[in-house]
């Protein structure tokens, strides 16, 4: 590989490290955007089948070109800025929403050595960068100078902060048993132990000893992304479309892309942190990216399944679930895991 790249390295000279990093960024973001586009089609198809409908089937064979048509439509639509809006902040809102969604992928490993930035504080970076997104939502709601976007953005801020706390405590449990903030090390730590040696690798993954945290993390991830049944932020019957009411064209599309990119991010993080990432469930099958993609696809299906199945929760119920149920459970489980690790019954020695 190095021999093949040698002429290119000589061509760019001192600029090669920057060019190589940029190439890796494009290699992550381009497929991600394609996945986001076709996730919208998958969502419409899955929900259609659940409601005994066909879903999109007109644009291209079996409707496969529908996401391209939707993207082109949004690309050529005018971005209308309301008269009373703060124009600079109005445009900044969608950018602040999508930037953290893309930046978070820098520390996500796709396989052994397949990561853009293999930093030791990857988990901490993820917590920090994903919490920035709420500022984009708040700015969008405030800059629109309209009551519905403002109400929606306040709801979003309260909801995202509430569930970030529970997710943070769930991640502390993962940190305790993995003894590392590096996501690659967390996956490696799930590939060892008695069950792994017996060939039943899936029994050594974190989802079994941390099952309550696994459920809390997944549900909190759905709430963090403002997806149904936690979509009170854009409840059509209450606040029309929340903070996105006044947006059109590509400005609206950026919020849309951020939401679906976050869905994929939460799904892949759940796979990496709790179900072994790219590790094979049984020892006689090889590890690889295929397993990570399969697990991520399953969790994405859970997102779509939840949307098609559950009615929207009332806002006070969502707040109560976050503060009075999830946070106490995660706090107790952090203590349980810490005591369990110190006891003679520890399974992590």
From Swiss-Prot:
A Pfam family it matches: NADHdh
Keyword Transmembrane helix: yes
InterPro entries documented for this protein: NADH_UbQ_OxRdtase_su1/FPO (IPR001694), NADH_UbQ_OxRdtase_su1_CS (IPR018086)
Residues passing through the membrane, by range: 19-39, 88-108, 123-143, 161-181, 202-222, 249-269, 284-304, 325-345
UniProt subcellular location: Cell inner membrane
Keyword presence, Cytoplasm: no
Molecular function via GO: NADH dehydrogenase activity; oxidoreductase activity, acting on NAD(P)H, quinone or similar compound as acceptor; quinone binding
Catalytic activity field: a quinone + NADH + 5 H(+)(in) = a quinol + NAD(+) + 4 H(+)(out)
Record membrane topology: Multi-pass membrane protein
Any one cellular-component term (Gene Ontology): plasma membrane
Keywords annotated in UniProt: Cell inner membrane, Cell membrane, Membrane, NAD, Quinone, Translocase, Transmembrane, Transmembrane helix, Ubiquinone
Swiss-Prot/TrEMBL GO biological process terms: aerobic respiration
E.C. numbers: 7.1.1.-
Protein family membership: Belongs to the complex I subunit 1 family.
Functional note: NDH-1 shuttles electrons from NADH, via FMN and iron-sulfur (Fe-S) centers, to quinones in the respiratory chain. The immediate electron acceptor for the enzyme in this species is believed to be ubiquinone. Couples the redox reaction to proton translocation (for every two electrons transferred, four hydrogen ions are translocated across the cytoplasmic membrane), and thus conserves the redox energy in a proton gradient. This subunit may bind ubiquinone.
Complex and partners: NDH-1 is composed of 14 different subunits. Subunits NuoA, H, J, K, L, M, N constitute the membrane sector of the complex.
Protein name: NADH-quinone oxidoreductase subunit H
The organism of origin for this protein: Aromatoleum aromaticum (strain DSM 19018 / LMG 30748 / EbN1)
Lineage: Bacteria, Pseudomonadati, Pseudomonadota, Betaproteobacteria, Rhodocyclales
